[in-house]
Regions:
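FNR/FR-type flavoprotein reductase catalytic core
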Residues: 1-125
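Local cysteine-cluster metal-coordination motifs and their immediate loop/turn environment
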Residues: 30, 101-102, 123-159
Length: 162
């Protein structure tokens, strides 16, 4: 058994800053642990669910300002985490996110458009867990030292700065 894989978030980068901690789907639980560890000026936790069957709600409320979005609008903002940010007119200096690829793409675009430092944790299936098989590769702006192409091995590089 191998794990955990990849690199964690650097919580010290958020010190003295307003932070978004954003999670969706199976990316929600890792954001809770990050919220517990992080010391920053303002901690805004934005999590997305499909419906009212939310989980870890009380724990998130104890860790920071919680904003919820649901696809069906049954709890919080109707839509996704980006809809919640826009509806609540939230502002941040740094973003940490974990969740499905479409959510992470939207967060990356938002961060780039607004000049916000952004760190994402990518979700991919991992076969070997040591970077040899390249099953978990995704495209990246930076060249991977292993393959010398614009890819990241999620099992080895996991966290991405965008």
């Amino acid at each position: 058994m191998i794990g955990p894989l990849g690199n964690g978030f650097s919580v010290e980068k958020a010190e003295g800053k307003r932070a978004f901690l954003m999670g969706g789907g199976i990316g929600v639980p890792p954001i809770l642990e990050l919220a517990k560890q992080m010391q920053c000026e303002k901690k805004q936790i934005v999590v997305g669910y499909r419906n009212a069957q939310t989980f870890l709600r009380e724990e998130f409320e104890a860790a920071g300002e919680l904003y919820i979005s649901t696809e069906d609008g049954s709890v919080g903002t109707k839509g996704n985490v980006m809809d919640a940010i826009r509806e609540q007119k939230l502002k941040a200096d740094i973003i940490y996110a974990c969740g499905p690829t479409p959510m992470l793409r939207a967060i990356k675009q938002y961060a780039e458009e607004n000049g916000i430092e952004c760190y994402i944790s990518l979700e991919e299936r991992m076969a070997c867990g040591i970077g040899a098989c390249l099953a978990c590769v995704c495209k990246s702006k930076e060249k991977d030292a292993h393959s010398n192409v614009n890819n990241k091995r999620i099992c080895k590089d996991r966290r991405a700065h965008v």
